[in-house]
């Protein structure tokens, strides 16, 4: 089951948010860059440009260019568009394992998930300590940038039915934009590992 090109999925999410906000595709011209640094360069050169960057690149770009500011949080926009009690979330990262590996190493997978959840809890409880580890691991060049970015990263851990509902809603949006982006249909229940 292919999930399509990662950059196309980002475009589908953006187009969904634009459309759901009442704008037509014709009202917005999208230009994609392959690196966050390219977007930051365009923003530095053109004061009328609008850029879309993920964290921590937003925080790093603002630190280098004080004329930049955050005007939209896509997670908040996504959440505001979810009606009828939908638990859909703007999912940007998941842990995936194939069924053979899961069957052979269920305890290992469960341990990984438990430690992953603990890591996220640690990051929320001690952003300064987490930022130092993030810098040490080379994920972000400076701990100060990581620490400033962490609250806006929306790092969460979901499992069980909450995870399934959040991801299924997200995949439904991708399906509506381009069915092939999710392999032609929504995944069956056995796609999800409900611990």
Predicted regions and their residues:
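Conserved C-terminal helix/tail region of periplasmic/extracytoplasmic solute-binding proteins
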Residues: 168-195
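Short, small-residue-biased leader/transition segments that mark boundaries at the very start
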Residues: 2-7
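Ligand-binding cleft/hinge of the Venus flytrap
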Residues: 10-32, 41, 47, 60-67, ...
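Pocket-lining segment of extracytoplasmic ligand-binding domains
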Residues: 38-133
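Secondary-structure end/capping motifs
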Residues: 102-177
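Short, surface-exposed acidic
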Residues: 25-29, 138-149, 181-188
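Short glycine-enriched loops at secondary-structure junctions
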Residues: 8, 74-78, 138
